[in-house]
């Protein structure tokens, strides 16, 4: 048997491949072009890394707080400090005491007391007065009621004294203010003495009538 011979394979090179090969061969032959190309590639990589780092830094940056700036004051309240004791005056006028290791001075206490008293006086001046003064005959009725009450008390003391001596079988000592008789009286006679009973009813009725007059006023 005879061996079959294979025809040789022909490879066709395109014009673009030949052009690239010629460029690469020309660049390899020129070392200056190779250095310039490497430098440009390095600059491109560096620029891209710097831009990426700046973007990441700006996204991760936190707002800084100025620690040296004093805090803003509250416009609703004002604080006044004297010595080691501080007072705070709020908008509605009430006093808030900030406690400290020392007590406020006497002058400060007096000042706050005067302010509180002035506020109370202003508040009372705005309130309507329900009972402005007393009725016209109130004073005279009160005087009459006190007189009748005093007469009633005197009569009760006199009767108790006569009752005491009647129990002891001894007459009481007569003076200018004593209307007791010299004759001996029994305890029952003293309790039911018509003179004492009449005077007692008179003084009691005077007190009751005066109280009614006061209520009518």
Curated annotation (Swiss-Prot):
<dbReference type="GO" id="GO:0005634">
    <property type="term" value="C:nucleus"/>
</dbReference>
<dbReference type="Pfam" id="PF17242">
    <property type="entry name" value="DUF5315"/>
</dbReference>
<dbReference type="GO" id="GO:0005737">
    <property type="term" value="C:cytoplasm"/>
</dbReference>
<feature type="compositionally biased region" description="Basic and acidic residues">
    <location>
        <begin position="172"/>
        <end position="189"/>
    </location>
</feature>
<feature type="compositionally biased region" description="Low complexity">
    <location>
        <begin position="60"/>
        <end position="78"/>
    </location>
</feature>
<feature type="region of interest" description="Disordered">
    <location>
        <begin position="167"/>
        <end position="189"/>
    </location>
</feature>
<feature type="region of interest" description="Disordered">
    <location>
        <begin position="1"/>
        <end position="85"/>
    </location>
</feature>
<protein>
    <recommendedName>
        <fullName>Uncharacterized protein YBR197C</fullName>
    </recommendedName>
</protein>
<feature type="compositionally biased region" description="Basic and acidic residues">
    <location>
        <begin position="38"/>
        <end position="48"/>
    </location>
</feature>
